[in-house]
Curated annotation (Swiss-Prot):
Glycosylation sites: N270
Record's GO cellular component terms: extracellular region
Taxonomy, superkingdom: Eukaryota
Its biological purpose: Secreted aspartic endopeptidase that allows assimilation of proteinaceous substrates. The scissile peptide bond is attacked by a nucleophilic water molecule activated by two aspartic residues in the active site. Shows a broad primary substrate specificity. Favors hydrophobic residues at the P1 and P1' positions.
Protein name per its UniProtKB record: Aspartic protease pepA
Compartments it resides in: Secreted
Prosequence residues removed at maturation: 21-67
Cross-referenced PANTHER family: ASPERGILLOPEPSIN-1-RELATED, BETA-SITE APP-CLEAVING ENZYME, ISOFORM A-RELATED
Main subcellular localisation: secreted
Family label: Belongs to the peptidase A1 family.
Top-level EC class as recorded in UniProt: hydrolase
Assembly behavior: Monomer.
A GO molecular-function descriptor: aspartic-type endopeptidase activity
Organism: Arthroderma gypseum (strain ATCC MYA-4604 / CBS 118893)
């Protein structure tokens, strides 16, 4: 993704761009994920490089070099990718829902056949309108990219439809996307100011259906090792326990940004824990500001926090050849706890084992954001541990333990 620098100008044009379906104000719908066999054998550093590039961070050479490699996968680990089925025009596509971007881009009839083979493709409906002179382009840190044209077409998720959604049709995609047969594109759920369409950014699907919804929010219940669910327009109280802890969102740059009060490290991958238990051995002062992003696989935090965590993992080392922190796959991994307004959001230690590199070493789900002024990223490693509410009123974001 590219960073948008003229935010004010972009915001000024949104009201005239797209029109949602007739207002009902009572809609609520659920969009469950589905599991797709994962055939691509990317090195885990590729996910790390993508995250760094997406948020404008410098990509260390070691990470860039490692991202170009591959590793074997096993049927029992990293064997599925979780996507959401979305009807675009007349086509049902498997899309990644991404709260860190604002583009809806897809493989299409415009994509060369040798690139689209094995993917479901978008076929513009009879009522689709091409936006002449409009284009889009995305680039990621692992050298993957895509670009193309823009149509206005009907998009439906969970039975709720907008008839004038900007659909970014891929005319060319890089080999990294071609090889990833599990996904047919991406649907952004950040604030619309981040949309990359030129000459005028377009609204997200969520913004286009907002007036139809019972409540101006969506929730996600992402799971570790199984499909999760996105719910739009309502909060399903059966999916969480206890009260939801809310904190203010900083959306000045278009992202779902928030500030945690601090963190602690304790417990372990084989231990039980309570939210306020004595096993949470270390409490560290100083707030942590970051971005909640379902489109980033890893959790990226400052060097001092990352180093603090891995000094509690026996055998952990920062491996230049692998592009990040690695550790013995049988290591005991402590829990990571983020304190948000008095609520302790616990990431179980087992979530920190992102991917096996070889028969003995594994790549960590927590990596460095690079420090300095670069943002911290609370990606799927963190979000899969929580029930999360993304509320445009405020705006604010809420967290609770999953039921």
């Amino acid at each position: 993704m590219v960073l948008i620098t003229q935010l004010g100008a972009a915001l000024a044009v949104f009201s005239a761009l797209t029109v949602a379906a007739p207002t009902k104000g009572k809609a609520r719908f659920s969009a469950p994920q589905v599991g797709i066999p994962k055939k691509a054998k990317h090195h885990p550093a590729a996910a790390y490089a993508r995250a760094l590039h997406k948020f404008g961070m410098k990509i260390p050479k070691a990470v860039s070099d490692a991202a170009k490699g591959s590793v074997p996968t096993t049927p029992t680990q990293n064997d599925e990718q979780y996507v959401t089925q979305v009807t675009v025009g007349g086509s049902t596509l498997n899309l990644d829902l991404d709260t860190g971007s604002a583009d809806l881009w897809v493989f299409s009839t415009e994509t060369p056949q040798d690139e689209s083979q094995g993917h479901n493709i978008y076929k513009p409906s009879s009522g689709a309108k091409r936006l002449d002179g409009y284009s889009w382009e995305i680039k990621y840190g692992d050298s993957s990219s895509a670009h193309g044209d823009v149509f206005l077409d009907t998009v439906t998720v969970g039975g709720v439809t907008t008839s004038s959604q900007a659909v970014e049709s891929a005319k060319e995609v890089s080999s990294q996307f071609v090889k990833d047969k599990a996904t047919d594109g991406l649907m952004g759920l950040s604030f619309s100011v981040l949309n990359t369409v030129q000459p005028q950014p377009q609204k997200t699907f969520f913004d286009n259906v907002l007036s139809q919804l019972e409540q101006p929010l969506f929730t996600c219940t992402l799971k570790h090792g199984e499909p999760g669910t996105y719910d739009f327009g309502y909060i399903d109280d059966s999916k969480h326990t206890g009260e939801i802890a809310y904190t203010q969102v900083d959306n000045s740059n278009g992202w779902w940004g928030f500030t945690a009060d601090g963190y602690s490290i304790g417990g372990g991958s084989n231990s039980s824990y309570s939210l306020y238990g004595a096993q949470h051995k270390r409490a560290n002062g100083g707030s942590i500001s970051g971005i909640a992003d379902t489109g980033t696989t890893l959790m990226l935090l400052s060097d001092d926090v990352v180093g603090d965590y891995y000094q509690n993992v026996q055998g952990a080392t920062q491996d230049q050849m692998q592009g990040g922190w690695v550790f013995p796959c049988d290591a005991n991994l402590p829990d990571f706890i983020l304190n948000i307004g008095g609520y302790n959001a616990v990431v179980p230690g087992k979530f920190m084992n992102f991917q096996e590199i070889d028969n003995s070493m594994c790549f960590g789900g927590l990596q460095s954001s690079g420090g300095g002024s670069t943002p911290n990223i609370f990606g799927d490693v963190f979000l899969k541990s929580q029930f999360v509410v993304w509320d445009t009123q405020g705006p604010r974001i809420g967290f609770a333990p999953q039921a």
